[in-house]
């Protein structure tokens, strides 16, 4: 029995209360992602980042205010913010992870009939999995990389945008 089975009622309550939204694992990056989605493997993102921050230790908040936060904590907060913004724009959320190839994509959406992979970077801005997915899948013309930085476009189809530009996707 998976954790999703054990906590099914609690997860459903959180979903009905609109406190979280789910990002389902997909086993393939082809359109239609819903055909490859697994209901038993997912990430749960809060719909209210301020609630998440209220649950955190004061020292974490101090690091955020002083802009000295690094590592997984910063990346997790950024990823949650991006996922929440996409959810509020009406996109069903998916993520991709392949244990064999070690490729992973933070968030995947479908826009205008095309799969769009999205990476969220807080520190190391390399996006090897995104680059590989784009190279191996001709039907995915571009992908987004959201960073705490500036705009950029690479020859391999990666569009780099500052975090706040998620509003324009």
PLM region spans:
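Accessory nucleic acid-recognition modules appended to NTPase machines
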Residues: 1-104, 109
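Short, basic, helix/turn surface patches
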Residues: 49-54, 120-128
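Short catalytic-loop micro-motif centered on adjacent basic/acidic residues
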Residues: 95, 117-120
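Active-site beta-strand-loop-beta-strand hairpin of nuclease catalytic cores
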Residues: 109-117
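Catalytic cores of nucleic-acid endonucleases
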Residues: 122-163
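Ser/Thr/Gly-rich flexible loops in soluble cytosolic domains mediating phosphotransfer, phosphorylation
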Residues: 163-169
């Amino acid at each position: 029995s998976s954790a999703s089975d054990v906590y099914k009622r609690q997860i459903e309550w959180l979903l009905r209360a609109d406190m979280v939204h789910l990002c389902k694992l997909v086993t393939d990056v082809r359109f239609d992602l819903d055909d490859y989605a697994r209901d038993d493997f997912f990430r749960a993102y809060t719909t209210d980042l301020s609630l998440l921050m209220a649950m955190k230790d004061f020292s974490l908040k101090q690091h955020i205010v002083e802009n000295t936060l690094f590592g997984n904590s910063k990346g997790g907060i950024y990823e949650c913010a991006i996922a929440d913004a996409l959810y509020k724009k009406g996109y069903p959320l998916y993520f991709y992870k392949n244990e064999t190839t070690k490729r992973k994509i933070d968030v995947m959406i479908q826009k205008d009939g095309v799969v769009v992979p999205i990476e969220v970077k807080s520190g190391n801005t390399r996006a090897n999995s995104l680059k590989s997915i784009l190279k191996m899948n001709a039907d995915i013309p571009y992908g987004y990389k959201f960073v705490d930085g500036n705009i950029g476009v690479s020859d391999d189809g990666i569009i780099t945008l500052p975090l706040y530009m998620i509003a324009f996707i």
